[in-house]
Amino acid sequence: MSEALAVLPDDTFTREQAEVVAAQYTNVAIEDDQGAHFRLVVRQNGEMVWRTWNFEPGGTYWLNRYIADYGIRKPQ
């Protein structure tokens, strides 16, 4: 039985939420870290396919979909 994947909330997100999601994938990472503000980035073959600042209202709508489509799960 597979474990449920953590996803980001529908609005802004915290560093803790971003770290939990990024820890599940090899190609999702926190970048442009400025302390309180940072981006969660999805890459494919090294190329960025989507990114969202943690403070963007509603920014996770597309980010969650790109993670679902392009995210490469880490081996468990």
Swiss-Prot record:
Pfam families on file: DUF905
UniProt keywords, alphabetically: Plasmid
Residues annotated as signal peptide: none
Family membership: Belongs to the UPF0401 family.
The protein, known as: UPF0401 protein YubL
